[in-house]
């Protein structure tokens, strides 16, 4: 009984220590910080990297390390990027194993080729809600460096990324990410496991690079076209595409193609590739006429 009592006191001391740690860094609204407080969910998120290639891991926005503590137990090198100087100081104090692997910078401004000396890595984190889309656009810029990405984001954004054509949530992120990655919606997370609780539910997803190495179209035009038509998603393509031809008049039958009567959420990634080639060919023809 005395032994059990000592165990109980030790458990209580550990619990109090965790509570003190939870209060060590105050969440900052301007950084979109919502600290995860459920250790079980943190471990589940950390375990999502196990299905990724056996590569180093980069965690974005570790905060107070609730996810980090499980990542560093895995047989992979781990680095963490944190913009909040208070969190960086906390991590240095509480995770001495990370040593020089805590990077106190803005992820969105970083050259990701220098993180692991040009080697590929897995991206993960409890991503700041206000910049999650920007994080994934950055991931796409370094898609050959990041074969796998996991983590937690707003449920709404997760649904958009995982949505299929014909779904109302299908949009810019859906097309651009699914062009290069296979997407898995893993599980939903309630609001009450965060400090402070966000106003929306969250979700954990995993994105794994597919076998596509070349879209078969002009990638810059593809991205521009996708963003253009989804910014007017309720309009037919023949209407929204006109702004891509300033000062130019496409041939008479250009807008009568069957695809032009559809709305952007009805097109698959492959159909967007075909549309890009269709639009690109017309732009080249018109430019040649203009220069002749």
Task: Map each language-model feature to its residues.
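Primarily a LysM-type cell-wall glycan-binding module
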Residues: 233
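Catalytic cores of RNA-modifying enzymes
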Residues: 4, 8-228, 248, 265, ...
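Class I Rossmann-like S-adenosyl-L-methionine
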Residues: 240, 253, 290-292
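N-terminal export/assembly leaders
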Residues: 250-257
């Amino acid at each position: 009984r005395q032994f059990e009592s000592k165990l109980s006191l030790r458990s209580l001391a550990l619990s109090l220590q965790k509570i003190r740690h939870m209060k060590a860094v105050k969440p900052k609204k301007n950084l979109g910080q919502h600290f995860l407080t459920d250790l079980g969910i943190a471990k589940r998120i950390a375990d999502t990297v196990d299905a990724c290639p056996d590569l180093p891991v980069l965690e974005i926005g570790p905060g107070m390390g609730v996810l980090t503590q499980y990542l560093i137990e895995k047989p992979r090198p781990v680095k963490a990027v944190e913009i909040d100087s208070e969190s960086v100081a906390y991590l240095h104090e509480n995770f001495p194993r990370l040593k020089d692997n805590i990077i106190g910078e803005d992820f969105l401004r970083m050259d990701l080729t220098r993180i692991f000396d040009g080697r590929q890595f897995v991206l993960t984190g409890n991503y700041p809600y206000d910049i999650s889309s920007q994080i994934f656009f950055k991931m796409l810029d370094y898609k050959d460096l990041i074969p796998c990405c996991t983590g937690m984001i707003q449920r709404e954004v997760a649904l958009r990324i995982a949505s299929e054509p014909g779904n109302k949530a299908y949009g810019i992120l859906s097309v651009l990410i699914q062009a290069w990655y296979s997407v898995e919606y893993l599980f939903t997370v309630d609001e009450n496991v965060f400090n402070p609780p966000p106003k929306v539910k969250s979700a954990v997803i995993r994105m794994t690079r597919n076998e596509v190495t070349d879209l078969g179209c002009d990638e810059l035009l593809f991205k521009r076209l996708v963003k253009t038509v989804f910014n007017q998603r309720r309009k037919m393509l023949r209407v929204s595409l006109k702004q891509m031809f300033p000062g130019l008049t496409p041939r008479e039958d250009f807008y009568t193609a069957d695809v032009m009567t559809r709305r952007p959420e009805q097109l698959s990634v492959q159909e967007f590739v075909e549309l890009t080639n269709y639009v690109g060919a017309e732009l080249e023809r018109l430019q040649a006429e203009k220069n002749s």
